[in-house]
Amino acid sequence: MKLCYNQATTLENSNLVKDLEYCEKNGYDYIEIRTMDKLPEYLKDHTLDELKHFFQTNHIKPLALNALVFFNNRDEAGYKEIITEFKGMMETAKALNIPYVVAVPLVTEEKILKSEIKRSCVNVLTELSEIAKPYGVKVALEFIGHPQCTVNTFGQAYEIVEAVGRDNIGLVLDCFHFHAMGSNISDLEKADISKIFILHMDDTEDFPVGFLTDEDRVWPGHGAINLDQMLSILKEKGYSGAVSVELFRPEYYQLSAEEAIKTAKDTTVEVVSKHFTLETTK
């Protein structure tokens, strides 16, 4: 299994240049590039060609653009914006040889029937599939374990991916989001493992279902999630994708970027290596 870094872990105490430097130094195989802030910030003073050259001359490679945000149940103007943004992402993915784009469902206070959520998600993801196909890019739907997210459990997300029925549409399995809204472990046991494109590794303080927020995340193995159970199921089912550590904890933003990146690796390796062989270079 290969190790990936998600830039949310140093959201407030680093930038793409530093993240790449310290991830390369600490033996990460991949990075998920944040398209809403870290990439635009980088492009103020650098070019995509410079970024491409970095990846060509170093071990670390880009795994995903993270993320196409709030893609479903939008009005006509919002829908057009999403499609335009996604087409731009395809050009970035092509330039940097990035295999995945993460797609995040709408978060809203509005009550929307699950049937309407599914219909919209299936329609948009099917269109994204068509757009992505010539680029060889896959789209990974990331359900968010929060009551206000329109797709907030593994089972709901898996049903949507199944309904789309395209090889280039799958899931992000985030351990925090799985735990946070009480996703059913039996749904994971029954899932087609080829539909899980990316594994997000994290842990959390022990708050009740429905009360957890991203800020409650802690280093893998330092919280309340039964990570061993999830990892053993993934191992048994033959998961072969990357594991990407993703934390949003404010107190970790007080650390130096290098310390956070090293600790994220060490804690992830400690948890994951009980079940998978990690191929990190350092």
Curated annotation (Swiss-Prot):
A divalent metal cation binds at E142, D174, H200, E246. Its cofactor is a divalent metal cation. It catalyses: scyllo-inosose = scyllo-inosine. It comes from Halalkalibacterium halodurans (strain ATCC BAA-125 / DSM 18197 / FERM 7344 / JCM 9153 / C-125) (Bacillus halodurans). Keywords: Isomerase, Metal-binding. The gene is iolI. Gene3D superfamilies: Divalent-metal-dependent TIM barrel enzymes. Binds 1 divalent metal cation per subunit. Pathway: Polyol metabolism; myo-inositol degradation into acetyl-CoA. This is Inosose isomerase. It comes from the Bacteria.
